[in-house]
C-alpha cells in the first residue's frame, strides 16, 4: 500500500485567530494591509497563513482569516475568524470574545465558567503572535460572523458552550482525519521507534503525548489519533511492551469497548464514567451529578482526587482486560492522566 503523502493539513481556529490578530495589529500600528502573516505555534513550527481582509480606521484595525481544515470533513472549514485591534493604556494584551464566540456555562472546561470559549493555549498563541509586532498594550476582540448559527451544528451545547463556537487548538495545526493512509503511517512510525526502543507509548492526542513525555523519552511516544485498537495490535507484534497513555475522556470509550474513538464510531464516555463510579462505590449524590454532567471534565469537578483515582483504576483495569482478551500474550500497561497532567492510575506497568 502506498501512503498518500499529499494529504492536506489544516489550521485550527486558534491559529486562524492568531493570524487575524497579528494582521490587525500590523494594520493598526503600521497602517499596512498584509496578504499573509507568519505566526509561531506551541510546537515550534511557524505557519504562513493567508489574510482575507484588513480594514483600517481611526484607532482600530480589523483583519479576517478563513479557517482551513485540510482534508478533514470539518463543518468549520472556511469559517471566517475576525479580530479587531486597538491600543489600551496598559502594556498588556487583553483578549475578549465578541459576537459568534461561545460562552462557557458549565464547569470542567479549560475556559472558566462565564468566560468566552477561548482556550488558554489559544490566548498564549495570540499573545506570542502580537508580541512579534509590538510590546505595546493591545486589546483584541475575536469575532466569528454567524458563529452562533454554525455552533448549532456542533457539539458545543452538549458540553455547555452556548451562543457561538469555541476558539481552540493545542498545536495550531489540524492533521488529516484518521483513515487507512494514516494507519499505514502509524506502521512506519512504529518501525522507526522499534529501531531504538523495545517498548512504545501510544498516546491518542497531543495532550496525552505531552503528559507522557514527562515519564518517557519523547522519541518512544507515538500519537495515533482515534485508531487506538489498531495501533495496539500493530505495536504488540513488534514491541516487548506496549503502554497506552491517555486522558480520561478518550480512554473511557476504550473502557466501553470502542477501539476506534472517532465520534462517528460511538460515544459512551459519561455512561462509562457512571458505570465505573458505581463500581467504585461513590456516594449517590456524586453519582447523580456525574450522570447529569455534560462532559467528563465537568463530572471530574464533582469528585475528590481520591475518588477520581479509585474510578480511573477501575477504568484502567477494564481496559487492560479488554486488550488482553484479543491479545493474551501482550505485555501491556495503561496510564490515565488527570487533566492537570498528574497520573491518576497505572495498571500493568
Swiss-Prot record:
Family: Belongs to the CbiD family.
Recorded superkingdom: Archaea
Reaction catalysis annotation: Co-precorrin-5B + S-adenosyl-L-methionine = Co-precorrin-6A + S-adenosyl-L-homocysteine
Gene3D superfamilies associated with the record: CbiD-like (3.30.2110.10), CbiD-like domains (3.40.50.10720)
Statement: the UniProt record of this protein carries the keyword Chloroplast: no
Pathway involvement of the protein, from the record: Cofactor biosynthesis; adenosylcobalamin biosynthesis; cob(II)yrinate a,c-diamide from sirohydrochlorin (anaerobic route): step 6/10
Bridged cysteine pairs (disulfide): none
GO annotation terms (biological process): anaerobic cobalamin biosynthetic process; methylation
InterPro entries assigned: CbiD, CbiD_sf
Keywords attached to this entry: Cobalamin biosynthesis, Methyltransferase, S-adenosyl-L-methionine, Transferase
GO molecular function, one term: cobalt-precorrin-5B C1-methyltransferase activity
EC number: 2.1.1.195
Protein name: Cobalt-precorrin-5B C(1)-methyltransferase
Enzyme class: transferase
Record keyword Flavoprotein present: no
Organism, scientific name: Saccharolobus islandicus (strain L.S.2.15 / Lassen #1) (Sulfolobus islandicus)
Amino acid at each position: 500500500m502506498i501512503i498518500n503523502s499529499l494529504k492536506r493539513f489544516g489550521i485550527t481556529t486558534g491559529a486562524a485567530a492568531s493570524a487575524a490578530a497579528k494582521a490587525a495589529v500590523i494594520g493598526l500600528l503600521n497602517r499596512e494591509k498584509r496578504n499573509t502573516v507568519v505566526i509561531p505555534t506551541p510546537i515550534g513550527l511557524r505557519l504562513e497563513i493567508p489574510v482575507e481582509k484588513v480594514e483600517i480606521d481611526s484607532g482600530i484595525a480589523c483583519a479576517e482569516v478563513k479557517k482551513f481544515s485540510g482534508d478533514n470533513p470539518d463543518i468549520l472549514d472556511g469559517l471566517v475568524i475576525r479580530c479587531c485591534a486597538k491600543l489600551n493604556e496598559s502594556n498588556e494584551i487583553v483578549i475578549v470574545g465578541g459576537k459568534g464566540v461561545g460562552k462557557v456555562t458549565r464547569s470542567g472546561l479549560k475556559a472558566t465558567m462565564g468566560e468566552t470559549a477561548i482556550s488558554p493555549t489559544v490566548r498564549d498563541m495570540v499573545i506570542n503572535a502580537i508580541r512579534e509586532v509590538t510590546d505595546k498594550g493591545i486589546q483584541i476582540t475575536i469575532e466569528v460572523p454567524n458563529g452562533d448559527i454554525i455552533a448549532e451544528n456542533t457539539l458545543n451545547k452538549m458540553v455547555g458552550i452556548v451562543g457561538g463556537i469555541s476558539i481552540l487548538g493545542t498545536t495550531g495545526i489540524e492533521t488529516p482525519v484518521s483513515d487507512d493512509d494514516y494507519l499505514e503511517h502509524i506502521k512506519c512510525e512504529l518501525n522507526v521507534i522499534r529501531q531504538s526502543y523495545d517498548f512504545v507509548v501510544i498516546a491518542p492526542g497531543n495532550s496525552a503525548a505531552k503528559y507522557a513525555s514527562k515519564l518517557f523519552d519523547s522519541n518512544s511516544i507515538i500519537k495515533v489519533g482515534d485508531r487506538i485498537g489498531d495501533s495496539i495490535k500493530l505495536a504488540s507484534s513488534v514491541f516487548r511492551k506496549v503502554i497506552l497513555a491517555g486522558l480520561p475522556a478518550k480512554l473511557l470509550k476504550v473502557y466501553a469497548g470502542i477501539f476506534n474513538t472517532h465520534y462517528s464510531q460511538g460515544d459512551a464516555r459519561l455512561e462509562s464514567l457512571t458505570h465505573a463510579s458505581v463500581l467504585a462505590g461513590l456516594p449517590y449524590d456524586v453519582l447523580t451529578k456525574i450522570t447529569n454532567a455534560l462532559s467528563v471534565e465537568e463530572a471530574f469537578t464533582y469528585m475528590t482526587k481520591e475518588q477520581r483515582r479509585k474510578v480511573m483504576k477501575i477504568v484502567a483495569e477494564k481496559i487492560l482486560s479488554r486488550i488482553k482478551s484479543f491479545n493474551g500474550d501482550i505485555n501491556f500497561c495503561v496510564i490515565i492522566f488527570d487533566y492537570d497532567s498528574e497520573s491518576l492510575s497505572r495498571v500493568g506497568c
